[in-house]
Amino acid sequence: MNLLVIGAHPDDGEYRVAGTAVKLAARGHRVKFLNLTDGGAGHHEISGPALAARREKESAESRRRLGIDAIETWSVPDGELMPTLELRREVIRRIREWQADVVITHRPNDYHPDHRYCSVLVQDAAFMVT
């Protein structure tokens, strides 16, 4: 089975799906986390490129520790995700490339706008990819 976890930010997949990802990866399933923004906001001490770089390193370490196959992070600025046609097409492309059997994402009524828009993108992409 191929699992694709699509989150708005680096660390969203780890917070929400790490247990499932570890169990599936340990059983030989392919697991990928896709982060739609760079994670450059939301910290009280650093932000922008410095925080995005830190999150990229954290993602690499998460991949190693969780034993998952891949983590991809897009360059969309944190806090600026919008459910555009262009991004929907990119999500569709990633679902097809990974040959995802299961896609997990945010709930549509989340408190964070990036989480809500990520959910919309994935819902729309899932409809279009079939």
Label the model's feature ranges:
Residues M1-I6, M82-T130:
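Metal-dependent de-N-acetylase/amidase catalytic core
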Residues M1-W98:
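Active-site rim/loop-helix segments in enzyme catalytic domains that contact anionic ligands
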